[in-house]
C-alpha cells in the first residue's frame, strides 16, 4: 500500500511531467512558426526541448514506476533506470553546443556564418544524441548489478524466478553513477560550459571597453554586442539552473558511494532531490519567455491565436509574431533583417534559408533599430550605416564594410 509520501511524490511528478510537455512543445511550436527564431542556435534549443519533452513523456513515468519496486526482469528494469540518464546526457550536450555556438558568435563573428551552418548543427545534434544513448545505456553492456541477482538474492524481495524488485540502486551500480555518469559526463561538461561563458563575458567586456574610445557611430556596434551578451546571459542562466537542479541528487549519490557505513538518505530527502532534477525540464520555457523578446511575443501569439482561438493567425516560416502583433495585416508585416529585406522574403521573392541568417539573430533578439526601419523600404541597406554599426564588433576585424560586415553582425 503506497504511503502518503509516495502518493504526494507521484502527484508532483505527474504535474511536472504535464508542465514539461506543454512548455517545451510551446518552444518547438514557436520555432516552427516564427522564421525569426529559425537559426542555428535555436536548433540546439529545440534539441534541448525535445529531451525535456521526453522527460515528461517517458522518464517521469519510468521514475514513478521504478519507485514502486515492482517485480521485473533485471535487464528490463535496468533499461527503465538508464533511460533518464540518456535524456540528462542529451540535455548536457545541447547546453554545451549552445555555449560553443555563442562563443563563436561573440569571439569571431565574421567567421560565424562560415563555421556554424544549419547542416553542421544538425550533424552535431545527431552525434550528441548517439553519444547520449551510448553513455546512458552503458550499464546494459555489463556494468550493472544483474549478476548479483542471479545468485538467489531476489527471493527475499518476494519476486519470482528470474525477476528482481525493480529499484534504481539495486540494478545500477553506484560506482557507475559517481565516477562515470557524474564526474566524467556531467561535472566535466558543466565546468567546460563555465569556462566558455566566462571567456564570452571577458571577450565582450574587452570589446565594449574598446568601443568606448570610438566616435558616436560606434554606439550601434556597442548595442549589437550588448544584445549578444544578453543572449549569452540568458543561456548561462539555463546552465546554472541545470546545475542547481541536478547537483543535489548527484551529491546524495556521492555520499552513498563514498560513505557506505553512513545511513542511506531517507525518502523525505530522496524524493525532493528527484523531483528537483525533473523540474529542470519545466524551467527553460519560462527563461525564454522572460529573457528573450522574440520567444515571448511568439508564445503570446500562439496562445491567443491557436489556444484561445482569437483570429490572429500568422504564417509558419514567414513573418514574425512580433511583426504581426505590431501591424495586424499581412501586407504590412515587415520585421526587417540586417539584409534590408522584409522577413520571409529574399530579393528574388523566394523564402529565406534559415542557416543563412546573420549570427546576430541567435535566439531571436531583434535589434530595435532594424525593427523601426520603414516598412516600404525594401531596397538595399545603407552600406555606410552597416559599416558604422558593425565597426568595432570584433577586435580582430576593425573597419570592415558592406557585405563582409553583414556576416559578422552581432545582434542577439
Swiss-Prot record:
Key words of the record: Cell membrane, Disulfide bond, G-protein coupled receptor, Glycoprotein, Membrane, Receptor, Transducer, Transmembrane, Transmembrane helix, Ubl conjugation
- Annotated glycan sites: 154
Q: How does it sit in the membrane?
A: Multi-pass membrane protein
The record, for Pfam families, names: 7tm_1
Compartment list: Cell membrane
Q: How is it modified after translation?
A: Ubiquitinated. Deubiquitinated by USP4; leading to stabilization and expression at the cell surface.
**InterPro entries, alphabetized:** Adeno_A2A_rcpt, Adenosn_rcpt, GPCR_Rhodpsn, GPCR_Rhodpsn_7TM
Task: Provide the transmembrane region boundaries.
Answer: 8-32, 43-66, 78-100, 121-143, 174-198, 235-258, 267-290
Its GO biological process annotations read: adenylate cyclase-activating G protein-coupled receptor signaling pathway; apoptotic signaling pathway; eating behavior; G protein-coupled adenosine receptor signaling pathway; inhibitory postsynaptic potential; locomotory behavior; negative regulation of alpha-beta T cell activation; negative regulation of inflammatory response
Segments of this protein annotated with the region Disordered: 368-412
List of residues binding adenosine: 169, 253, 277-278
GO CC terms in record: plasma membrane; postsynapse
Q: Which domain of life is it from?
A: Eukaryota
Q: How does it assemble?
A: Interacts (via cytoplasmic C-terminal domain) with USP4; the interaction is direct. May interact with DRD4. Interacts with NECAB2. Interacts (via cytoplasmic C-terminal domain) with GAS2L2; interaction enhances receptor-mediated adenylyl cyclase activity.
Record function comment = Receptor for adenosine. The activity of this receptor is mediated by G proteins which activate adenylyl cyclase.
Q: What is this protein called?
A: Adenosine receptor A2a
Query: What is the native source organism of this protein?
Result: Equus caballus (Horse)
Q: What is the lineage of its organism?
A: Eukaryota, Metazoa, Chordata, Craniata, Vertebrata
Instruction: Point out the gene that encodes the protein.
Output: ADORA2A
